[in-house]
């Protein structure tokens, strides 16, 4: 990625995943997000680039930080933002995703942000509506804006991503965050490791250009970044780990395990955290943690994504789906 010129133009209509984005597309979004940070840090947190545009947030899975982040991002760009409460909607009365999509499409929104438990839901929605679609997480498939905000956090702390050793640890099997991060970090030249018990590793990891470890000591050795994943017990139908106590003993990030990584290694977590399950509180709140910075970068990245998709100066013709 060294010495390549990054275009300010983003040639896609949707953001459905990291897969389908080129390294230069990713850098375009990260560079724009760098600019958006200043907006969020000024007293008047507002710009009018999307004034008159309408954003609908359609969350079929519970979310606090992601939905709030998308809402703030849209409002700071000047868009009109509507949060659809699925719990009180026609979906609960038997309406299908397609029916809901067609109804919302008739209202002429400019962008739909969707989170859904089914992999491929965002892509299906994009085929049925006339506006841009952003995937805010679809099952265990992808979570592109999380990977982008993680990359932005790493780049701002370390100055680069290329050649860094990034260890992604924990429940990789059920994690859309892990999948999107692996795709993005590989695209930008990082050395990616996954660290997990064999029961929490998906099939086909060898095809994703990662090093696989079942030991935290081996997996964290000389790591520049340690990215912990939440143990997603709500997605587990069987017995994937013997007990929470045993899981933390072997795979929870505490001070002793963190010593295996480089002394200046970053500690990351996409949230929400299970303290005492995958990460100890003194590590989550410690000097190497950039978890709160990830939250701040989330708003900037989502601002960048929506501006890149909807601002005609950055997306003439609203491009092709990614």
UniProtKB/Swiss-Prot annotation:
SUPFAM superfamilies: Aspartate/ornithine carbamoyltransferase. Carbamoyl phosphate binds at residues 65-66, 115, 143, 146, 271-272. Its EC number is 2.1.3.2. GO terms for molecular function: amino acid binding; aspartate carbamoyltransferase activity. Pathway: Pyrimidine metabolism; UMP biosynthesis via de novo pathway; (S)-dihydroorotate from bicarbonate: step 2/3. Pfam families: OTCace, OTCace_N. InterPro entries: Asp/Orn_carbamoyltranf_P-bd, Asp/Orn_carbamoylTrfase, Asp/Orn_carbamoylTrfase_sf, Asp_carbamoyltransf, Asp_carbamoyltransf_Asp/Orn-bd. The keyword Transferase applies. L-aspartate binds at residues 93, 176, 230. The keyword S-adenosyl-L-methionine does not apply. Coiled coil: none annotated. It is an enzyme of class 2 (transferase). One of its GO terms (cellular component) is cytosol. Gene3D superfamilies: Aspartate/ornithine carbamoyltransferase (3.40.50.1370). GO terms for biological process: 'de novo' pyrimidine nucleobase biosynthetic process; 'de novo' UMP biosynthetic process; amino acid metabolic process. It catalyses: carbamoyl phosphate + L-aspartate = N-carbamoyl-L-aspartate + phosphate + H(+). It comes from the Bacteria. Keywords: Pyrimidine biosynthesis, Transferase. Belongs to the aspartate/ornithine carbamoyltransferase superfamily. ATCase family. Heterododecamer (2C3:3R2) of six catalytic PyrB chains organized as two trimers (C3), and six regulatory PyrI chains organized as three dimers (R2). Catalyzes the condensation of carbamoyl phosphate and aspartate to form carbamoyl aspartate and inorganic phosphate, the committed step in the de novo pyrimidine nucleotide biosynthesis pathway. This is Aspartate carbamoyltransferase catalytic subunit.
